[in-house]
Swiss-Prot record:
Cited SUPFAM superfamilies: PRTase-like
Function as written in the Swiss-Prot or TrEMBL entry: Catalyzes the transfer of a ribosyl phosphate group from 5-phosphoribose 1-diphosphate to orotate, leading to the formation of orotidine monophosphate (OMP).
Family membership noted in the UniProt record: Belongs to the purine/pyrimidine phosphoribosyltransferase family. PyrE subfamily.
Gene encoding the protein: pyrE
Organism field: Campylobacter concisus (strain 13826)
Descriptive protein name: Orotate phosphoribosyltransferase
């Protein structure tokens, strides 16, 4: 599966000067919503991701995603794997479980995102699950932005990767984009201003 081509064909592989949620800057941004707006394509990607997880023998009961970006990817993964789906969301900047969702003691979860960069949001969701007695047995995403080690792709992790090394992480593709701290961003130094994805229709 050529994930890069899928993103480009969907108009989801953006080039410019972007302000990421981490506060860092990048010349490239993956707008997964453009890929997932096609239910047939979203289903195909989720089926592929579920097959990868099954191949590695990971047993799980449910899927959890951090809102907002991970919800569509996580829901589709749960559908493909025939599992329950829930999501966490930030309340006053604290990742929380709301809307009547419950976690059973010992319930095994895959935490799923659309894109994982350092894995910070996915890790926050995992901590919520574990604090309620659940067990996170792995992480998944459509794509990895090159920082975290992907079990099925064989790449190495980078120092700022936040996902735990003792839990497998699965993805359909790996995008190695340069990410810059604002004070060291060459795009800023050239006079360009970073925009937050979505602020200008992206």
């Amino acid at each position: 599966m050529d994930l890069e081509k899928i993103y480009k064909d969907a108009g989801a592989y953006l080039e410019g000067h972007f302000l990421l949620s981490s506060g860092n800057h990048s010349q490239f941004y993956l707008q997964s919503a453009k890929v997932l707006e096609d239910p047939a394509l979203a289903g195909k990607l989720a089926d592929e991701l579920a097959a990868v997880i099954e191949k590695f023998g990971i047993k799980f009961d449910s899927v959890c995603s951090p809102a907002l970006g991970g919800i569509l990817a996580g829901y589709e993964l749960a559908r493909a794997a025939k599992k329950r789906f829930i999501f966490t969301e930030r309340v006053e900047k604290v990742m929380s479980l709301r809307r009547g969702f419950e976690v059973k003691k010992g319930e095994k979860f895959i935490v799923c995102e659309d894109i994982i960069t350092t894995g910070g949001s996915a890790l926050e969701a995992a901590h919520v699950i574990e604090s309620l007695g659940g067990e996170v047995v792995g992480f998944a995403a459509l794509a990895n932005r090159g920082f975290c080690k992907v079990a099925n792709l064989g790449n190495d992790s980078k120092p700022n990767a936040k996902l735990p090394s003792d839990k497998p992480f699965f993805a359909l593709g790996n995008f190695e984009f340069e990410i810059y701290e604002p004070e060291h961003c060459p795009l800023c130094k050239s006079g360009s201003k970073a925009i937050k994805p979505g602020s200008r229709g992206n």
